Swiss-Prot record:
One Pfam short name: YbgS
Basic and acidic residues composition-biased segments: 84-105, 117-126
Low complexity bias: start-end ranges: 27-47
Region annotation Disordered: where it falls in the sequence: 27-126
Signal as UniProt keyword: yes
Signal peptide coordinates: 1-24
Ranges annotated as biased composition (Polar residues): 54-64
Domain of life (superkingdom): Bacteria
Name of protein: Uncharacterized protein YbgS
Keywords of the record: Signal
Length: 126
């Protein structure tokens, strides 16, 4: 099948326009709320922004109630590093990151009564 340059140009233009129209139809131009979400992110009132809609069946009176902040221990006290040396603080931070310098000093594998604190996590002592 032999095509002339004009026919090739016409076919290419038709396919380009058709694919562009298909992409525009899929984008959902009528329901696009990107500008509303951007306005809501900037602090403006945007009632049509989906980000401002509360989840279904949520009672806002029960959110963040009680005394104190949300980062408290179960006994209501906050965590501090009072009484820790700089070395202890460093080891504690390293272990929180998963890079404990001496895992046997931080991990208790038994009940702590039978002097099994210095055993490895698999129960061995080597």
């Amino acid at each position: 099948m032999k095509m002339t340059k004009l026919a090739t140009l016409f076919l290419t233009a038709t396919l380009s326009l058709a694919s562009g129209a298909a992409l525009a139809a899929d984008s959902g131009a009528q329901t696009n709320n990107g500008q509303a979400n951007a306005a809501a992110d900037a602090g403006q009132v945007a009632p049509d922004a989906r980000e401002n809609v509360a989840p279904n069946n949520v009672d806002n009176n029960g959110v963040n109630t009680g005394s104190g902040g949300t980062m408290l221990h179960s006994d209501g006290s906050s965590m501090n590093n009072d009484g820790m040396t700089k070395d202890e603080e460093h080891k504690n931070t390293m272990c929180k990151d998963g890079r404990c310098p001496d895992i046997n000093k931080k991990v208790q594998t038994g009940d702590g009564i039978n002097n099994d604190v210095d055993t490895k996590t698999d129960g061995t002592t080597q």
